[in-house]
């Protein structure tokens, strides 16, 4: 069987399943993987101990006998405003929190895993000989962005994310490790897409917490996404004010990227902002009702009243589960402290009462965050 034809067939099948792009690369140790060791030694990983897994240094260590990696890309962008453009009216009276674009809809792990498994089924129909295949979506010991680069899907930008000339960076990556010997998407003599960041420094300069040590190097301990999702304890006080209204993740270094200004929106309903229960005491103007009732800039007064039971119910099947109740409510407290809300605002009384209750709760991290917020708005 023609190996080159097999690789073309795989890409076609992946697109038929719903992926935007697909590439194949041999499982080998790429130069960027070696750089990870130094990055970890500098402590930039923070509490993300899973990044120390030695299998991440070489795809061949992730699965016995692996020869090839199939990398699939799925666009999650929507036509909603970017974080820097989303400025709802009355923010000083009715403050909202920002949830990262990728987390508005269904859990991407589930969305991509279903498609990857469907592709594995097609592979077994195409290749009758016995072979192993494992699908991972941000869960295996694989550095997807590096592998994707060598599969021809993009270049690693100064913000450390994979960038694609047509799609920007609003996309997810999923991989299939397999013992099949497949022809790489890049032919002999071909190199990965060139770095098109040029002299641009917008992502580096826009980061409010100055998480970028230098171009292509990020100190995750200062990254708002890390602080709001991965960090389990209290957020360092010097980083709280720069966090602004972020309650889960951050899109700033992507939103300022010129390549994302032309990024197309995904047609998938799975990535549209998830609808939420009505949570206002009074109905708002029709023009903003959709915003209030979805994960697109939800109201802080609602987030601050979430019980642990509410959290489990509302965020079942959502990426926000990762932050857990403590993390999300802690983040909402910080956002409330940064909101600039003052007495007389539409939701001031409700937010004040919620923060006072949280300041007395049994969870020390949440209580301290609420106390900090109270000191800022009273």
For each predicted feature, which ranges?
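Auxiliary alpha/beta "docking" domains used to position bulky ligands
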Residues: 1-196, 235
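Iron-sulfur cluster-binding cysteine motifs and their immediate structural context
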Residues: 16-19, 202-225, 246-270, 354
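Surface-exposed helix-capping loop/turn segments at secondary-structure junctions
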Residues: 21, 125-132, 213-214, 342-349
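Short, contiguous, pocket-lining structural segments
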Residues: 168, 192-199, 215, 239-249
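A short, charged helix-loop
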Residues: 179-182, 186, 218-231
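Conserved helix-loop functional segments at active or binding sites
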Residues: 182, 209, 213, 229-232, ...
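Alpha-helical scaffold domains
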Residues: 235-378
């Amino acid at each position: 069987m023609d190996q080159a034809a097999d690789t073309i067939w795989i890409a076609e099948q992946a697109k038929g399943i719903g992926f935007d792009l697909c590439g194949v690369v041999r499982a080998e140790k790429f130069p960027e993987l070696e750089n990870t060791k130094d990055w970890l030694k500098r402590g930039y990983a923070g509490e993300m101990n899973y990044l120390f897994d030695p299998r991440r240094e070489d795809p061949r260590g992730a699965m016995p006998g692996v020869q090839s990696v199939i990398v699939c890309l799925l666009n999650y962008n929507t036509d909603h405003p970017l974080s820097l453009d989303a400025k709802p009216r009355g923010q000083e009276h009715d403050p909202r929190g920002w949830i990262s674009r990728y987390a508005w809809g269904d859990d991407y792990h589930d969305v991509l895993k279903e498609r990857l498994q469907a592709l594995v089924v097609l592979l077994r129909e195409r290749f009758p000989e016995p072979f192993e295949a494992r699908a991972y979506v941000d869960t295996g010991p694989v550095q997807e962005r590096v592998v994707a680069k060598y599969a021809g899907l993009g270049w690693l930008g100064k913000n450390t994310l994979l960038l694609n000339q047509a799609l920007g960076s609003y996309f997810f990556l999923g991989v299939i490790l397999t013992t099949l010997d497949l022809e790489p998407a890049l032919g002999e003599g071909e190199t990965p897409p060139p770095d098109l960041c040029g002299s641009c420094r917008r992502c580096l300069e826009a980061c409010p917490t100055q998480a970028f040590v230098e171009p292509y190097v990020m100190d995750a301990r200062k990254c708002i996404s890390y602080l709001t999702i991965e960090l389990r304890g209290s957020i360092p006080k010097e980083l709280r004010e720069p966090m602004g209204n972020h309650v889960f993740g951050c899109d700033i270094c992507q939103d300022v990227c010129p390549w994302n200004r032309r990024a197309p929106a995904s047609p998938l309903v799975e990535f549209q902002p998830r609808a939420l229960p009505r949570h206002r005491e009074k109905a708002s103007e029709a023009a903003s009702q959709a915003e209030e009732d979805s994960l697109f800039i939800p109201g802080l007064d609602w987030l601050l009243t979430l019980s642990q039971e509410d959290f489990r119910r509302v965020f079942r099947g959502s990426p926000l589960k990762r932050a857990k109740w403590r993390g999300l409510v802690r983040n909402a407290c910080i956002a409330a402290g940064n909101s600039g809300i003052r007495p007389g605002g539409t939701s001031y009384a409700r937010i004040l009462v919620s923060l006072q209750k949280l300041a007395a709760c049994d969870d020390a991290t949440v209580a301290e965050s609420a106390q900090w917020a109270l000191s800022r708005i009273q």
